[in-house]
Design a protein with these regions (language model features):
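Binuclear metal-dependent phosphoesterase catalytic core
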Residues: 2, 67, 73-74, 96, ...
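Internal catalytic-core helix/loop-beta-alpha segment
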Residues: 77-114
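Helix-adjacent hinge/juxtasegments
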Residues: 51-89
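N-terminal active-site segment of His-dependent metallophosphoesterases
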Residues: 1-49, 60, 66-67, 144-149
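A short helix->loop->beta-strand "cap" motif at the edges of active sites that frequently abuts
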Residues: 48-51, 125
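Active-site environment of divalent metal-dependent phosphoester hydrolases
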Residues: 11-15, 37-41, 59-64, 86-90, ...
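Active-site neighborhood of phospho(di)ester-bond hydrolases with catalytic His/Asp-centered motifs
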Residues: 6-8, 29-35, 53-58, 80-82, ...
């Protein structure tokens, strides 16, 4: 089983991430869904043995990180974006996000930007916003086994 920690919208507040990583056994990867990529880079230096995937958010204008990525972890295809380019704050049904994600046939879609935790089951995929480490004080864990994804949102 692959266990992934998912953070977003840390906005310079990485202490909770460090505590969570230190207290979490068997972490297979970390995903950061933007705002701030500098925080994700700092975590990658602190934990060089844990794969860390990240995208840039609306507050990462100078970052060279991509707007979205598709990765494979534990046999699952994961689409990651911050969400500002997909207008997630303004589209009640997440239409643009779903259109972009559908291109890669994902098992898991991760976005941030709204600072609000969110889970939706969409066809064979789970759409997940872990919330904000800084503001809603939440993060998520995904467990993947044989391509099957289960997620949970946790309070910090």
């Amino acid at each position: 089983m692959k266990r992934i920690l998912i953070f977003s919208d840390t906005h310079g507040y990485t202490d909770p991430c460090i505590r969570i990583i230190n207290e979490s056994p068997n972490i297979g990867a970390i995903i950061h869904a933007g705002d701030y990529t500098r925080d994700a880079e700092d975590l990658s230096y602190i934990y060089p043995d844990i794969p860390l995937h990240y995208v840039r958010g609306n507050n990462d204008m100078l970052s060279r990180a991509p707007d979205n990525i598709t990765i494979i972890e534990g046999g699952a295809r994961i689409f990651v974006t911050h969400g500002h380019m997909e207008r997630v704050k303004y589209e009640y049904e997440l239409t643009t996000l779903k259109l972009r994600a559908a291109r890669v046939n994902p098992n898991l879609v991760i976005f941030g930007h709204t600072h609000k935790p969110y889970t939706e089951y969409w066809g064979n995929a789970t759409i997940l916003n872990p919330g904000s480490v800084r503001y809603s004080r939440t993060y998520a864990v995904a467990e993947i086994e044989n391509g099957r994804v289960t997620t949970k949102i946790l309070d910090i």
